[in-house]
Regions:
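A surface-exposed partner-binding patch
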Residues: 1-111, 212-332
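Mixed-charge (acidic/basic) macromolecular-recognition segments
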Residues: 140-257
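Internal, hydrophobic cores of structured domains that mediate oligomerization or house catalytic pockets
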Residues: 68-195
């Protein structure tokens, strides 16, 4: 949905978007989200072109800036606008990445407050990354990644790439006026300092197949390690094999439900997230995921996430994720 640039900075529009998101998703939009909107409002034609050249386009919840009262198409739920098949309920899309279904979302563990930014490629098997605290950090990383990749071509005197580097510099200058201005590194040096670093083990989260981890305490059937401590390949292979066995998947679901109704929803949450990630269009797995996530979020006091999960379950077979009434055009 095309958004006139000045609407990102319009106080009335911003307030209306915040109210709508709070009413529909239950999420309190963070200050960093509105700094991202300020950044978009500050872009001139050259900087807008540079953003497009990065493959980045505001999307999902950002479409509400065009019309905060926009309604979904008949019979659909607005909470699935921009919600891709494997998006966990904690993920709210705000930016499309242009290639292989790359998209970025605000991440909320409790469905009320934002806890950073997540991203992943919906068209491949990679997991979700949660290495950026804010939307502008995510954009800055893309700028520096592009500069790193263009540097060799520009060094050879390629005029088109030199022009792109100049445009990237102007885009960076606008962004650093809002955030990350203290980070003086650019290109490869920036990536090495802020992007390539392996994050520490997060003992507050439990390992999940989607790569994002689940914020929950309690016991799990496999005694799963904390987020960041597992061998990702071994864990993923084991879980894929388990879930491919219909009897084993059913038994795992039954045990998770038993634990949840006994007061420990940890297994229901992590297994529900795993099944959601690895449903692959299998109706039985989709149903198990929906059932487990519903009970887990209810027991954890996360009703907004329970509602998002239920809405997504109803609409996971949609051929596309553009559900607002005005026609949208986005790459798959």
């Amino acid at each position: 949905m095309a958004v006139e640039t000045e609407r990102y900075g319009d106080p009335e529009v911003r307030e209306a978007v915040a109210r709508r998101v709070g009413a529909e998703w239950g999420l309190e939009l963070p200050d960093s989200f509105f700094r991202f909107a300020d950044f978009l409002a500050a872009l001139g034609p050259v900087e807008q072109r540079a953003l497009r050249d990065l493959g980045l386009a505001p999307y999902g919840v950002m479409d509400l800036f065009a019309d905060p009262s926009a309604l979904p198409r008949e019979g659909l739920d607005i909470r699935v606008h921009g919600r891709y098949y494997r998006d966990p309920p904690e993920f709210l899309t705000f930016l499309h990445g242009g290639t292989d279904g790359l998209h970025f979302g605000l991440w909320s563990d409790d469905g009320r407050l934002c806890d950073g930014v997540a991203s992943y490629y919906t068209n491949d098997g990679d997991g979700i990354e949660r290495c950026h605290r804010t939307p502008l950090e995510a954009v800055r990383a893309r700028i520096e990644g592009a500069e790193r990749d263009l540097a060799d071509y520009a060094a050879d005197g390629d005029e088109a790439e030199l022009a792109r580097l100049t445009d990237l510099g102007r885009l960076r200058a606008v962004l650093t006026g809002f955030e990350t201005g203290e980070r003086t590194e650019t290109g490869l040096a920036y990536s090495e300092a802020y992007v390539y670093r392996r994050p520490p083990v997060d003992t507050a989260r439990i390992t999940t197949m989607d790569g994002a981890g689940a914020l929950v305490t309690g016991a799990t059937v496999l005694d799963r390690p904390p987020h960041g401590a597992a061998d990702v390949h071994r864990f993923g292979t084991f879980m894929e094999d388990l879930l491919d066995d219909a009897d084993a998947a059913r038994a795992a679901r039954d045990e998770a439900l038993r634990r949840a109704v006994s007061g420990d929803p940890a297994e229901a949450l992590v297994l529900g997230r795993d099944l959601h990630r690895a449903s692959y269009g299998r109706a039985e797995h989709e149903a198990y995921a929906s059932e487990l996530l519903a009970v887990a979020y209810r027991e954890l006091g996360r009703p907004a996430l329970a509602e998002v999960a239920a809405a997504h379950h109803r609409h996971r077979a949609l051929p596309d994720v553009d559900v607002l009434r005005r026609a949208l055009s986005r790459p798959a």
